[in-house]
């Protein structure tokens, strides 16, 4: 898919994948490989992740699931792809979670190929908090648009997001970063 308009036709604007694609495009993603899944399970996501990683041009991959089993399988697939020269960085997040829960999940995954994003976010035009996969999609889109990988992410404004569900103390931010969470403000 090369545009949000094209993505809307394929997956629908109101689907989770449609909303993720919108955020990725708003933040600068160019061409996006998307694979809809019928249910939130490791069995459903496995062929989707495999198909995307089989495309060697995939450099960033966003997971739409917040389930630990799905995220663990995602990490395994990304690590296996890297061994086959399929260099791809994954992005994922969680649903409603405390700072401690985010940190614990990131430590449990402990995957150098995955950017674990939190907390939940508010998307423009939405009243309910959106799962971490939406924040992950926005961040992946912004990183896809960057030409210089050495640029810091501090102060990066993600388009299409209006806020986060949690504001952490400095101590909590330090703990999140130490655990491997990319904490949004």
What label would you give each PLM region?
Residues 44-185:
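A glycine- and small-residue-enriched flexible loop/hinge signal that marks low-structured segments
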Residues 1-64:
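An N-terminal, globular interaction/scaffold subdomain
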């Amino acid at each position: 898919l090369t545009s949000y308009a094209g993505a809307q036709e394929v997956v629908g604007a109101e689907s989770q994948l449609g909303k993720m694609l919108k955020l990725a495009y708003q933040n600068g993603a160019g061409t996006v490989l998307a694979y809809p899944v019928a249910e939130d399970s490791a069995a459903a996501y496995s062929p989707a992740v495999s198909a995307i990683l089989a495309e060697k041009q995939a450099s960033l991959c966003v997971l739409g699931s917040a389930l630990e089993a799905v995220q663990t399988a995602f990490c395994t697939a990304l690590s296996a792809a890297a061994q086959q020269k399929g260099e791809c960085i994954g992005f994922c997040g969680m649903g409603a979670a405390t700072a401690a829960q985010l940190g614990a999940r990131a430590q449990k995954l402990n995957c150098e190929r995955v950017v674990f994003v939190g907390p939940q976010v508010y998307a423009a035009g939405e009243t309910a908090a959106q799962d971490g996969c939406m924040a992950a999609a926005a961040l992946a889109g912004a990183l896809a648009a960057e030409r210089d990988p050495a640029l810091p992410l501090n102060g990066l404004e993600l388009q299409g997001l209006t806020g986060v569900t949690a504001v952490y103390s400095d101590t909590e931010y330090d703990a999140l970063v130490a655990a491997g969470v990319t904490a949004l403000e």
